[in-house]
Every structure is written in C-alpha cells, then in structure tokens.
Amino acid sequence: MEAQLLFSEKQKFTQWWIWGIILLINSIWIVAIFVQLIGGTPFGNNPMSDVGIIITAILTILLSVFMRSIRLDTQIRSDGIYVKFFPFYLKFKKYFWYEISACYLREYKPIKEYGGWGIRGFLKNRALNVSGNQGLQLIFTDNKKLLIGTNKPDEMKQTLMNLGKLTE
C-alpha cells in the first residue's frame, strides 16, 4: 500500500539570468550559422569550420533542452520525504521518518553554503535546490545532512506540523 501524499512541489530553474546566458550563447551560434553558412562570410577573425559551427549550435540547443528538463520534485508522505531531481534521479529517493532525527525549515545562502544551485555539497552535507533561499533541512540518524530547497515553505511547514515531524 502506498503512503498517503500530503504535500507535493515541483520546481524548475526559472532564474532570468540563467536563461539570459543560455539565450545569449544560443544567439551567438544562430548568428554564426546565418553569417557563415547562409551568408558565406566567415564568422569572426579565426572562423570555425561549417561542420564545427553546426555541431556547436546543436550542442548549445541540447544544453538548453537539458536545462529545461531539470526538475526537483519533493513530496511529503505519511511515511517520509520523497525527492526526485530529474534527470539525475529517475526514481524518488525515499527518506523514511525513522531515518530522520531532525527536520526543520530554514533560510540558507545557496552560493555561500553550497556553492550554488543544483545537486550540491559532499557526503555529509548535501543540498538539492533550483531557486530561492528557503529549504527543508533534514538531519539523519547517522548525522548526515540534506537540505531540500522549497518555494512553498509555509505550506511545507504546516504539513510537517500536522504530521508532528517539525523539530525546530
């Protein structure tokens, strides 16, 4: 029998500056295609081959598609916390309540504490985040830590309080 779903959140990279950089990079290679391949004028002082431009343009577009596909799914269920960071985790990682010694929401500094967003940190102190500065801090019975970013801290806090699992 599947545990009851009490809270669910899906997050994607939506920061304007990330998409601005990706758009700028893609634009450069689209311009290169038009200038060199269609216009016949070499692009730049030391132009890349036509095949090189096509391959690079395809790779930058694939990077854009990949960035768009990244998604952090968080679920709070009656038996624990489930997290999937697609496409890195294809299935939910399950953290059962009996494995968690502390569970609380906190404000954090993504760049200072973890070096940015994504799958961050090392073995004993990890973070899964895509935006913002609010997160669910889990401390496990083996003293390892996991911070899961959230854009719904109030709703998450209420769910954890209703379950009696909020520790701080």
Model segments located where?
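A short, polar/proline- and glycine-enriched secondary-structure boundary/capping micro-motif
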Residues: 16-19, 92-95, 149, 157-161
